[in-house]
């Protein structure tokens, strides 16, 4: 349980095995979590700005209200991840799997969804993305 922990900026934690972890309210600024296994984890209301999650597995993780400004989720598994109310400014989701992810009330600005699978995802306005939602949420 790492609830409310503040980690030193710029930590290299790539390849970490952290499934079912509680990282709510934690601070991980500029942290490298590439290729990490973090499925079913709770990152709610944490600060993960400028962090890297390339090819990380965050399947069914809770990311509600967290700050991911300028973070990189390229090719990450974010299936059924809950981003409700999260800050997603300048985030890179290129080629990531966001199937059935929840973006309700999230602040998405200048994010890159090129090649990302958004099928069945719930968009910021509550509408569900249709079957042709690759790279963009099509109703």
Regions found by a protein language model. Name each.
Residues 1-139:
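Tandem repeat scaffolds
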